[in-house]
Amino acid sequence: MSVIQELHRQLVRKERSATEITQAYLDRIAQVEPTLHSFLTVTRDRALAQAAEVDKRLAAGEEIGLLTGIPLAIKDNLCTYGVRTTCASKMLEHFVPPYESTVTEKLQAAGAIMVGKTNLDEFAMGSSTENSAFGFTANPWNPERVSGGSSGGSAAAVAARECAAALGSDTGGSIRQPAAFCGVVGLKPTYGLVSRYGLVAYASSLDQIGPLAPTVTDAAILLGAIAGHDPKDATSLRVPIPDYTQALKPDLKGMRIGLIQETVGEGVQPEVKSALEAALKTLEALGATLVELSCPRFAYGLPTYYIIAPSEASANLARYDGVNFGFRAEGASDLLEMYMKTRAQGFGAEVKRRIMIGTYALSAGYYDAYYLRAQKVRTLIKEDFARAFEQVDVLICPTAPTTAFKAGEKTADPLSMYLSDLMTIPVNLAGLPGLSVPCGFDSNGLPIGLQLIGNVLQEATLFHVAYAYEQTTPWHQQQPQL
């Protein structure tokens, strides 16, 4: 039984009240936060007030949904009405949104309880949470290691049982890579399946919101609650949303799974490769047919992404100038100086780096050579995936080339940090769904993630394969000792 299902069972049978469950998670947060720093804001009073409302409904004999009374954490780049939303940036340190994001509105309507807002790399730009203006989030399995990024706070909170599940956002791997590093399940849905309204934009053609959860079932429940068309998001897809839990079947007879050859070569940690090989044997034993295939342009994903994403970021982040909201620098003698001082003092080094890259790529003399060419390569990557899905139902590869690295190890070398997302970035460029599921541990006791990639809107297929694998392996049952 999943964490959400077990908590729901306890509530319905009146074994525990919503207040008791919420208080237990808040106590856990208080216990481990000095070590982890998963949260930027803990909404203690609000959470207990929400729990009290759920208890009133239960006392009145009301039937409740699966998410009613379930404590969840929300990445701090999702707008929450009346609750500070910082994007882990000095620029928005005191910003309190006047509106609610669609996904958090849906969770509220489902009766879920928000216990807090989680840490991230500033404006979701990074792979370790070390770019947060408010300190990095430690890995629950080893606090000297990073939790991944940019949704490191959400991944660590789920792994450390500070919440039942969490929401993150994924632009180039920001849900899946931290999920792998922290040993939890993380899904980046098909582009447009989940509304982006109220998500503070980084790269709008790549950003997507998704669940991080302790089990595949929990992730399926959470996706079902947040997916669906939204007129407030022009890129939102008008498609029916199935009950994803119906796809959770234990055997894989007839399933064709393709191993992407380009993802098991140089640069992959040997223990990650071994875990992948063991996972492939397990999937075969469950009835799947394995096919080795090539996505020749997979390797071009990284350079393509680091032209397209910064280009979109340079446009999206132009709004932070000290005029309407957020941080405003003091001591400027005129408007131009105020703009310059605000942006110089308000943004961190990595955000400035990406704005500069993007502005350069979009400039008149370089637009064709960089941005336009990157968009053409993006199309070729999509075509590679389309050809692969003519042969198989699901593609498979490691989520990340390595397990979690030490804090401070890669901060001086941005390129080595960018390589953490080598396996995840092409999935965003193609707009496909990708899921990371735990598949073992290395010799240092650090989790390893297995990435499953599906065709457009094939989340149910990913859940099916991940669930079958999860049910025959012990990885999801292991928890960090904190």
UniProtKB/Swiss-Prot annotation:
Instruction: Give this protein's Gene Ontology molecular function annotations.
Output: ATP binding; glutaminyl-tRNA synthase (glutamine-hydrolyzing) activity
Task: Provide the active-site residues from the annotation.
Answer: K75 (charge relay system), S150 (charge relay system), S174 (acyl-ester intermediate)
Q: What are the boundaries of the signal sequence? A: none
PROSITE patterns with a match to the protein in the record: AMIDASES (PS00571)
What's one GO BP annotation on this UniProt entry?
Answer: translation
A cellular-component GO term for this protein = glutamyl-tRNA(Gln) amidotransferase complex
Q: Mind telling me which InterPro entries this protein's record contains?
A: Amidase, Amidase_CS, Amidase_dom, AS_sf, GatA
Alphabetically list the UniProt keywords: ATP-binding, Ligase, Nucleotide-binding, Protein biosynthesis
Q: What class of enzyme is it?
A: ligase
**Reaction equations catalysed:** L-glutamyl-tRNA(Gln) + L-glutamine + ATP + H2O = L-glutaminyl-tRNA(Gln) + L-glutamate + ADP + phosphate + H(+)
Q: What is its EC number?
A: 6.3.5.7
Domain of life per record: Bacteria
Which family is this protein grouped under?
Belongs to the amidase family. GatA subfamily.
Q: Tell me the subunit arrangement.
A: Heterotrimer of A, B and C subunits.
- Which HAMAP family does the record associate with it? GatA (MF_00120)
Give the function comment from the record. Answer: Allows the formation of correctly charged Gln-tRNA(Gln) through the transamidation of misacylated Glu-tRNA(Gln) in organisms which lack glutaminyl-tRNA synthetase. The reaction takes place in the presence of glutamine and ATP through an activated gamma-phospho-Glu-tRNA(Gln).
Protein name (Swiss-Prot/TrEMBL): Glutamyl-tRNA(Gln) amidotransferase subunit A
**Organism for this UniProt entry:** Thermosynechococcus vestitus (strain NIES-2133 / IAM M-273 / BP-1)
Which gene name belongs to this protein? gatA
